[in-house]
Amino acid sequence: MDATAYRGLLEEGLASLGVEAEPGGVEAVLLHLDLVREWNERMNLTAITDPQEMVIKHALDAASGLAVAGVEPGQRVIDVGTGAGFPGVVWKCLRPGIDLTLLESLQKRCRFLEEVGQAVIGPLAGGEGYQVVWGRAEDVGRNPAHRERYDLVTARAVAELRVLAEYCLPLARVGGRFLAMKGPSVGEEILAAEAAVEKLGGRLEEVRELELPDGGGRRSLVLIRKERPTPKAYPRRAGVPAKSPL
């Protein structure tokens, strides 16, 4: 990717979203996108490979989450089902001070994310505050090392909201938040997920709709506050939330 050609697109897009990059952040995001394209030749990381589309539909889409759920240095953040590192890696590039965990169920993608840690996050943040966890959300959500440990839990285009809630809310601390990054039409999903969110200890706090720059499409960002501990029965065993949503 020609960093000079796409740097301006990324910077202008971030400005339009109201997201400010910390020093070195823009360059780090572009390097991450380069690695995604390179590794995509060996494994399935993304169907979007045009450099301009990657900036808009991956980097800026990911960054839009920071416009709604601003994070502070030292806060613990987990990206559930991160895939190629969206939104988590982009957040870490733009906010190097966060303590980021990337949760991914495919081991080969975890290898890619570890390479990103060395090549991108290492030079930017000394490799600090960056962990890759191989596993399924249902299992990790029962692990005391992760359960109710995070200030912010996020997921992008992983599953419908009532399923995502069972994956993600058990990981958020009481008082923490869960940000679901969804497509343009989310109203029915939110209604269908109300009972699940309540059962898991959450409360809908905000739904913000925004338009990605340069015709990137409309997005809905759903922010849920964790108000009570999640009952010990949740998450259910691996595969059950998707097959039988709450």
Curated annotation (Swiss-Prot):
Its main location: cytoplasm. The keyword S-adenosyl-L-methionine applies. Its EC number is 2.1.1.-. S-adenosyl-L-methionine binds at G81, F86, A137, E138, R156. It is found in: Cytoplasm. GO terms for cellular component: cytosol. GO terms for molecular function: rRNA (guanine-N7-)-methyltransferase activity. Residues 221-246 are annotated as: Disordered. Specifically methylates the N7 position of a guanine in 16S rRNA. Belongs to the methyltransferase superfamily. RNA methyltransferase RsmG family. This is Ribosomal RNA small subunit methyltransferase G. It comes from Symbiobacterium thermophilum (strain DSM 24528 / JCM 14929 / IAM 14863 / T). The gene is rsmG.
